[in-house]
């Protein structure tokens, strides 16, 4: 790949610092909420996998954009993993649902092959991620975690702008 991964990350992240990873206390309830955005159906792991798949089947210009966004999502995944550790949880790719461990699945990704559908599904996924992050932030009573979530949301909003501009340029209104 031409260029550096750091350059790609810088192009698709807002450029503001991320808050330090710290929490008031270990909290399994908060960890379960964070795990949804870490490795759930609407999650950073899903976003990384979906962008990686989509960049493999698109042209160079679009490929580089999707790859750059995926790299930022990898950074978000790392942040959430560190947050899970701070909350006292192991950052495995599973969720607890009705006392069962459910592992992340590739069925969570959009398997579109048409550019229009790829961009629309990626925009939709970013919007769903923001909605999930906001719901989580409204439940959690830890300003450190909320600051981290709000910073990640800023990148997700940037991704929507980038993808929407790409859609307008490549597909039209």
Labelled PLM ranges:
Residues 1-173:
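Non-heme di-metal
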